[in-house]
């Protein structure tokens, strides 16, 4: 059966999360009088944030805890004394300011323009519902997509199969009509394959631990070879 629907993850796949996140911290930390070299901060923060997002996907922490604890643990690890009030303020400002930085991965516009002529495009994201649409609108990619599905709207998070079952029902598609593009092997690729949906792993960092049965690309424009 011919592919009719292309699902994309948003953060780390189209929207350059790490670059935009770094720019946001460069803005909000000095404004809160937190004096630290941004590279030193990010070196500690990024793996802590990654671990908390994994816990969040696994329903082990709440959204509120994620927003606070990833900053609290980073400051503690760096031995920087920051008041709880300031941490809560920073966590809210981060969410507010993040969508205003809009770097996309190379080839995003070109590949979306190419695919839109042939397929119906959709987003499936675990990102916070209140900012995902803002990110897409401010970066100029919102109008490429017919459907935006957030895990918060479903009530569970990727890699829960219910997210993909909901997505198929939402767009009135069969699994064999669809393909998923994303950066996270567990949350995007393996679960899609387990649902009978084809999948392509976006691997811009050239990670080498990719299972042999998974198709992987390093640049979004490489999708033209498959779609």
Segments and roles (model prediction):
Residues 66-70, 103, 110, 162, ...:
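Generic recognition of short, well-ordered alpha-helical interface segments
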Residues 118-119, 196:
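Glycine-centered short loops/turns at secondary-structure junctions
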Residues 2-10, 14-105:
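N-terminal helical cap/lid subdomain that shapes the substrate entry/recognition surface
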Residues 1-6, 19, 85, 113, ...:
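Asp-based, Mg2+/Mn2+-dependent phosphohydrolase catalytic module
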Residues 107-118:
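Catalytic-core regions built around general acid/base machinery
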